[in-house]
Amino acid sequence: MKRLLTLVVVCLASCALAQTGTPSKLQGKMKLNAGIVTEKLEETKAFYTSVLGFGVSFENEFYLLLHTPNGEDEISFLLPNHPSQQALFHKPFQQQGLYLTIEVDEVDQIYHELKKKGVEIEIDIRDEAWGDRHFAIQDPNGIGIDLVTHTKQ
């Protein structure tokens, strides 16, 4: 019985450590860069640079790497079936099951700027019970983009 109790205590302690965010071997510097496989590199570049103010970090004939206006985050786009890429990265995005969230300081300002530019608003600006104020647009690939300001509750 004492051995079983010790085993239970050790298991509970291990579970508690796992839930507290104690660093694992996978911890350390990680940077996420989402990539979308698409035929629409030119349209995508024009949308993200002219509508959202992104900059071009790198581009060639089959790859486009863009960064947010503050340079902190990046997103990439790749032509499908490109011979330089492995088969895992050949299939094009199918315009479903993906969205991006862009956190901004002043969602109302951006909302009005995009309306003035004639950008189609897919979800009108609104407040949510959980504290977000947001609206959504769609990029040329069919990706929903949720622009959000977290408000105080």
Q: Where are each of the predicted segments found?
A:
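Conserved active-site tyrosine of GNAT-family acetyltransferases
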Residues: 44-49, 114, 142
